[in-house]
Amino acid sequence: MSKYIALENLPVDLQHKGATQNESTADILKQLPHERLQAVLEKIPEEDLEVRRLLSILKKPEVVENEDVQQRRIRLAEILMVDEIDLENINNMENINGEEVDEEDDEDFFTPATSELIFARRFLINYSLERSRKRLQKEMERHQKFNTRQELLSRRTELQRMANLELAGSQLVSTKPISAVSLSTDDMVVATGSWAGDLQVLNSQTLQPLTQKLDSHVGKIGAIDWHPDSNNQMISCAEDGLIKNFQYSNEEGGLRLLGDLVGHERRISDVKYHPSGKFIGSASHDMTWRLWDASTHQELLLQEGHDKGVFSLSFQCDGSLVCSGGMDSLSMLWDIRSGSKVMTLAGHSKPIYTVAWSPNGYQVATGGGDGIINVWDIRKRDEGQLNQILAHRNIVTQVRFSKEDGGKKLVSCGYDNLINVYSSDTWLKMGSLAGHTDKIISLDISNNSHFLVSGGWDRSIKLWN
């Protein structure tokens, strides 16, 4: 008989506890699979389209009945835990999270325009020139009647009133964070979207629901925008890579889907109507922004240029320019009449999450993960940025200019749970609004600046007036 004992025959005391441990060996062993699963989950992209693509590569079903986005990620993680080879392959794949990008030449290239795009650009030339002419004429008339004393008094009164806005209402509207709020053209209703993928329309003064929750998207909703000339049509975008066009009817009490805009390959973070209402712009994590025909839902333009995902975009009031903000910490100005890049604005150290044009037509504000708001004057190409605001102690999630007064006020929100109000003359902070118990993701301001709405991680929409 051998005096040795085989390794597999060694007795294991599962109830043993170390001198500094409160857990037994059995308890620790039970936790190991969970810890491994969490480690794998951290390496898996959040975008549902990427998760489905990886499942397809592994020859697994992309979708299982009654499975939501998070359950699909967990299923992928469990598959990867079983097959270490597949895990290694995925770990070696580049650009899976948009963090690594192959180095390419920065040489500009052009593709032939379709007949639809040529027709759209001809319209945009005439439309933007006429809008610009009217805006400049209005500015000249205002200058001729300008009274310094009255102007200063009016601005001080308006800024003080804006800074003294108070919380007037709050409504819990979803089971997950509110990621988008948007006031209708007449400010009578507000549309909300959440990370649960649901849409809802509320009365903007009472916050009472006017529609049932509509499970419109799979995954997080990125943005909502109303048609500039209509109070019953809006668009939304989300993590599922889709833009959806809805018709809202107060009488029928619901939202009706008019169609989908399909083309982006990854999550869509922002969507905006062109000032004419004839076109739609979208920003996506597939490193492109795109221009669509609002009536036919046809893609007119696919614009590359950013090295990482595009998170936000905004149209200039004349309709000639668009500003895109990217995860590469750059914002870029594009002339959509010609398809050329006009300017690159570099001033953030972290990704840009929000972009907004002033109604004056020559200032654009960008907010980023560095907590800074940069305000650029595009008339001063050589001088670059006009001013830098140390706005929030964390991520700046949204910036908005006031509308009817020509952008005399700038409002922002961020992950420090605050809404800040700034004067566009001095860029000094005039006040802060505190009321959210968690991070704020989105806000919108009424046309006359008499009230604003906001939403965030506390799953509520709040009214300030």
Curated annotation (Swiss-Prot):
It is found in: Nucleus. Keywords: mRNA processing, mRNA splicing, Nucleus, Repeat, Spliceosome, WD repeat. Its main location: nucleus. It holds the Pfam family WD40. It comes from the Eukaryota. GO terms for biological process: mRNA splicing, via spliceosome; snoRNA splicing; spliceosomal complex assembly; spliceosomal conformational changes to generate catalytic conformation. Signal peptide: none annotated. One of its GO terms (cellular component) is nucleus. Present with 1770 molecules/cell in log phase SD medium. Component of the U4/U6-U5 tri-snRNP complex composed of the U4, U6 and U5 snRNAs and at least PRP3, PRP4, PRP6, PRP8, PRP18, PRP31, PRP38, SNU13, SNU23, SNU66, SNU114, SPP381, SMB1, SMD1, SMD2, SMD3, SMX2, SMX3, LSM2, LSM3, LSM4, LSM5, LSM6, LSM7, LSM8, BRR2 and DIB1. This is U4/U6 small nuclear ribonucleoprotein PRP4. It comes from Saccharomyces cerevisiae (strain ATCC 204508 / S288c) (Baker's yeast). The lineage of its organism: Eukaryota, Fungi, Dikarya, Ascomycota, Saccharomycotina.
